[in-house]
Amino acid sequence: MEHDFYQEDELLNSGLTNRGFLLSKVDEVISWARANSLWPMTFGLACCAVEMMQAAASRYDMDRFGMLFRPSPRQSDLMIVAGTLTNKMAPALRKVYDQMTEPKWVLSMGSCANGGGYYHFSYSVVRGCDRIVPVDVYVPGCPPTAEALIYGLMQLQKKIKRTTGFKYDSRQTH
């Protein structure tokens, strides 16, 4: 006769839930916390930056999703690239990305950041910020609305909850 671990878990959960306990895996708790406390850093390069600021204002209020803009890359875990990335700004983008702590994510906002946009064939424009840094979520539009940005951020939250796992390196010394 096989042992039914699922029934045991349900019995244990039902007994503890009514008493204020919650059973979960450490990985799930960490990924939930990471997804619901994103600290974005703005890398506003053009018109899309205005829409990004609007998403943080009182009408859309990104703070209610646990997102608080940080002024320093060392304090943030999400970079929002908003606008036209030129060849001259590309090294600065990479440098700022490298200063961010792990885990870090990148959201590309607008047609120009996604693929060069209207200026795609210009000699001075990088045809997508994904040529410089790895991008997790693309938000289309010229410029995308604040609702589109918030939708992209919610998609990133889902991705973080799905993929983030807790990794412990036993070689680290404190």
UniProtKB/Swiss-Prot annotation:
Cofactor annotation comment: Binds 1 [4Fe-4S] cluster.
Record-listed [4Fe-4S] cluster binding positions: 47-48, 112, 142
Record carries keyword Transmembrane helix: no
Primary residence: membrane
Alphabetical UniProt keywords: 4Fe-4S, Cell inner membrane, Cell membrane, Iron, Iron-sulfur, Membrane, Metal-binding, NAD, Quinone, Translocase, Transport, Ubiquinone
TM region positions: none
Annotated compartments: Cell inner membrane
GO-annotated molecular function: 4 iron, 4 sulfur cluster binding; iron ion binding; NADH dehydrogenase (ubiquinone) activity; NADH:ubiquinone reductase (non-electrogenic) activity; quinone binding
Cofactor: [4Fe-4S] cluster
Topology in the lipid bilayer: Peripheral membrane protein
EC nos: 7.1.1.-
One GO CC term, this protein: plasma membrane
Disulphide bonds in the chain: none
Catalysed reactions, as listed in the record: a quinone + NADH + 5 H(+)(in) = a quinol + NAD(+) + 4 H(+)(out)
Enzyme class: translocase
Functional summary from the UniProt entry: NDH-1 shuttles electrons from NADH, via FMN and iron-sulfur (Fe-S) centers, to quinones in the respiratory chain. Couples the redox reaction to proton translocation (for every two electrons transferred, four hydrogen ions are translocated across the cytoplasmic membrane), and thus conserves the redox energy in a proton gradient.
Family per similarity comment: Belongs to the complex I 20 kDa subunit family.
Subunit structure: NDH-1 is composed of 14 different subunits. Subunits NuoB, C, D, E, F, and G constitute the peripheral sector of the complex.
NCBIfam families: nuoB_fam (TIGR01957), PRK06411.1 (NF005012)
Name this polypeptide is given: NADH-quinone oxidoreductase subunit B
